[in-house]
Amino acid sequence: MYQEQRMSAIVEYLHTHRTITLDEICDMFTVSKDTARRDLVKLEENGEVMRVKGGATLSSSHIIDYSERTPTKAKEQIAKEAASLMSEGYDVLLDTSSTIALMAEYMDVKHVTVITNSIDNVDLLDQYTACDTFLLPGKFNGKNRNVTGPRTISTLQEYKVDQLFLGTCGVGADGITSPSEEEAFLKRQMIQCARQVIMLADHTKFEREFLHRVCDMSDIDILITNKEPEADVKEKIEQNQVRLIVTDFDKGEETQ
């Protein structure tokens, strides 16, 4: 198979599986690691993938729009667990995330004050009359159905909330990352105004690294996911005393 054919197949694979390793490329095409690495280098030069440790992921320009992402059983389990952590009378901040948007389905009609930059969160929470919801000001982003920008940042600086429910694109041993500089900056400000940071991340977000750093693992208080992270990430979680909740219904595990 020619290099161009392999490269096309790799990109097609990534649209379904999100990440690919050098070993997987070697097995798929019966090539050496050097050949697999050259394919990824070429794809990165073309702007189609982003190389990460031991493989590659889709570049930010190829990441599926927020509006096109569909709920999965894993995300529903994570959202249900996250909603159970809300308490009566809390002031909470909700990030823009397809998983966080699902939390509205599992809220037990608690009287909480919600601040968010997500249009979908506002729409979904409208069903709860006991919930006071505030949409942050800013520039509308049609791709992610949220508001961002300097006005959003400056308004966040006026708040101190009990809980932040944070979404993410990449989780690794070195911390949390995002493909968007603007998104990373916004998330950092959200973290600064929260007493407790709860991150929601399904297993596809692990071992993915992007250009812009959001925060260190030490900035997270609770991490909710659906599968046990790899050893290096779990070690970092334990070192920083992050409460890890694994919602895999086959295991029902929780690590503190």
Segments from the language model and where they lie:
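Conserved phosphate- and dinucleotide-binding cores of soluble alpha/beta proteins
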Residues: 2, 12, 19-25, 123-256
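HTH-adjacent hinge/linker in prokaryotic transcriptional regulators
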Residues: 2-9, 13-23, 28, 33-98, ...
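Amphipathic, positively biased hydrophobic alpha-helical segments used for protein targeting
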Residues: 65-66, 93, 100, 178, ...
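A generic "binding-loop/recognition-motif" signal
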Residues: 98-99, 121
